[in-house]
């Protein structure tokens, strides 16, 4: 009832899954776009639900293509040939219309025709047998057609997620992290706090919750290597649950900001629907050998970073002196990250 009259976007940032589900149950069948995001140390996640009937007016934001044509066949599948100095650039499923065609004048201003690409200079546009004979000239122009996107609710998507892979070298990690973030939320709901940095007992408790979820969905890892990878990622997620890194927040925050603009404008294809990212390669190799006390909170503004890298690493960062050449947009962002990292 609260959201039924609203049109806009609702964002859940670092809320527990139960709260996300509650809000999304309200937004899914209204005109309210829902985005959830979370960053835990070197891990990040984003989820979109723009409703069951979201109109994307322009999927890529590029200028419509156009080119001169040199022939159109009189056929069940009329074949259009463009000038050979320039590839037409179309893809299957694109739509085109025509102007300045001589002879086959029915094409001029015709309702957009769906394209099937046959080559870099040829494509078909459907039946042209009822048209006049082509005599010459003509220009095709691509028409951007609205695309209707059907988003699943968060409750439905938790059971059968659709992923955007942020790193094709880590395709096998998305499902692990999907279950891991759900288990992390369950842990926090049960215990009232996040797992402690580098605490083995808390990590084992989160692993047990994750295994229960995997078992209930028949998604247990198969084989020793897959099990080892899953356990390592889930353990690191537990260890870094209180982590808060400025560069990761900038990355996920920038991604979410773009999704908000897509939701409001209907321009550019939005995320469908989950995205998980990790940069565990940034973790120093000696971190697993350090004691838990190295990562304990110091009651400082850098506790979120200490939880991931340790206080010795933080002290090293604090004593580093960097020289940055240039202070444009990227330079300013770099300075911001450096200053927030200490």
Model feature map: region roles:
Residues 325-326:
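Conserved N-terminal Rossmann-fold NAD(P)-binding element of oxidoreductases
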Residues 253-268:
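Internal hydrophobic alpha-helix adjacent to the cofactor/substrate pocket in enzyme cavities
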